From Swiss-Prot:
Organism from which the protein derives: Protochlamydia amoebophila (strain UWE25)
SUPFAM superfamilies the UniProt entry points to: UDP-Glycosyltransferase/glycogen phosphorylase
Keywords: Cell cycle, Cell division, Cell inner membrane, Cell membrane, Cell shape, Cell wall biogenesis/degradation, Glycosyltransferase, Membrane, Peptidoglycan synthesis, Transferase
Pathway given in the UniProt record: Cell wall biogenesis; peptidoglycan biosynthesis
Protein name: UDP-N-acetylglucosamine--N-acetylmuramyl-(pentapeptide) pyrophosphoryl-undecaprenol N-acetylglucosamine transferase
UniProt entry tagged with the keyword Membrane: yes
Gene Ontology MF annotations: UDP-N-acetyl-D-glucosamine:N-acetylmuramoyl-L-alanyl-D-glutamyl-meso-2,6-diaminopimelyl-D-alanyl-D-alanine-diphosphoundecaprenol 4-beta-N-acetylglucosaminlytransferase activity; undecaprenyldiphospho-muramoylpentapeptide beta-N-acetylglucosaminyltransferase activity
Function description: Cell wall formation. Catalyzes the transfer of a GlcNAc subunit on undecaprenyl-pyrophosphoryl-MurNAc-pentapeptide (lipid intermediate I) to form undecaprenyl-pyrophosphoryl-MurNAc-(pentapeptide)GlcNAc (lipid intermediate II).
This protein's GO CC annotations: plasma membrane
Subcellular locations according to the entry: Cell inner membrane
Gene name per UniProt: murG
């Protein structure tokens, strides 16, 4: 029997990319199932692929504001968005509604609760966002990526792997082809460097200060700078020091960058850690110091202390000599193999399920009129 899934996600790529990854997994596993995205801001969201996924927009505004006018606007848009979502749900008739966080998702999830449609939430970060924290107790299940998150949510939490977009799987990409895409050699170790949407400038500055250390070493670099100006400047910088480097402002095919890399330097966003784990790449994490609730620190602690996949350096201590020493530790063949093996072991734990399986199981329980039992 065909299933119908409504997915609500909005805001940043950290919410949208896993949501689209889940949609692709559900379509692949169930074939005839229908997917509908419902949230605010989807028509203009740069991360959402409107050419692939059907969607409908509802009203939404931030709810947590000390400004009385913004608060009033938030309440009005919430009520309006809930009513719009109720009409959409009654027409679409989803078996399960899946939420990925941000205020954009609150109206559809409240509507699902009112209409008694099972809710599954996904919390990507170690420190839950306000929306998921508030809605967790209403959900049948909450998929979490970091074990620590369970202590901060009231819902029925289950650790799951992060849903990744189509093509972001280790066994789907040839390493030689990935290196060729960047014009790099299979005979050198490849360092992937990027700062993400937040704080790329500090990492770019760090790499400038390290440029003279790469000369005459077996290290080649893939550097995603986050801006065209930075990319142009760093291309010249690396060339002056005779460093083999592929420098780009942006890269749509990050799965190829991950497949080409032996080690990486980056911020510690949840998606970064999920992708590093999927491609089994050890790395140096420099948490973005201004992230909400310092969640990137907790994300990095998970990758370093629990997964045993890398080294954490706080930004104020990320001096060239410290980072260089850490890179040398990472690329040591014995240490590198040990960390890659640790990442693989954690990723492939038999007790670790996927969000897709969680959603499909919830839809089966719904058809049997059974609520899930809370795991102890």
């Amino acid at each position: 029997m065909s299933k119908r899934f409504m997915i609500t996600a909005g805001g940043t790529g950290g919410h949208i990319f896993p949501a689209q990854g889940l949609a692709q997994e559900l379509i692949k596993k169930t074939y005839s199932s229908s997917i509908l995205f419902v949230a605010g801001g989807l028509s203009t969201n740069k991360y959402f692929d409107r050419s692939i996924f059907p969607f409908q927009e509802v009203s939404a505004s931030p709810l947590f504001s000390k400004n009385p006018f913004k608060l009033l606007k938030g309440v009005f848009n919430l009520l309006r968005g809930v009513w719009q979502s109720i009409r959409i749900i009654r027409k679409f008739k989803p078996d399960v509604v899946v939420g990925f966080g941000s205020y954009y998702t609150v109206p559809p999830l409240l509507a699902a609760k009112i209409l008694r449609i099972p809710i599954v939430l996904h919390e990507a970060n170690s420190i839950p966002g306000k929306a998921n924290k508030w809605l967790a107790s209403m959900a049948w299940r909450v998929g979490i990526h970091f074990p620590f998150t369970a202590t901060l949510l009231k819902g029925n939490t289950i650790e799951v792997g992060m849903p990744l977009r189509e093509g972001y799987q280790l066994d789907q990409i040839d390493k030689i082809e990935a290196l060729s895409y960047f014009g790099l050699s299979k005979n050198n170790s490849t360092l992937l460097v990027f700062g993400g949407s937040q704080g790329a400038l500090a990492i770019n500055r760090l790499m400038r200060n390290l440029a003279n250390t790469w000369k005459n070493t077996p290290i080649q670099i893939i550097h995603i700078t986050g801006s065209i100006q930075e990319a142009d400047e760093l291309k010249i910088f690396y060339a002056n020091y005779q460093v083999k480097a592929s420098v780009k402002a942006f890269e749509k095919n990050m799965h190829l960058a991950w497949r080409a890399a032996e080690v990486f330097i980056s911020r510690s966003g949840a998606s970064t850690i999920a992708e590093a784990m999927e491609f089994e790449v050890p790395g140096i994490l420099i948490p973005y110091p201004h992230a909400t609730d310092h969640h990137q620190d907790k994300n990095a602690d998970f990758f370093v202390d629990i997964v045993k996949g890398g080294i954490k350096i706080v930004e104020e201590k990320a001096k060239p000599e410290i980072v260089l020493k850490s890179i040398q530790l990472l690329i040591d063949p014995i240490a590198l193999d040990k960390r890659k093996s640790a990442i693989h072991s954690y990723k492939c734990r038999p007790d670790r399920t996927t969000l897709c399986e969680l959603v499909l199981d919830t839809s089966e329980l719904k058809s049997l009129h059974k609520a899930p039992q809370k795991r102890k």
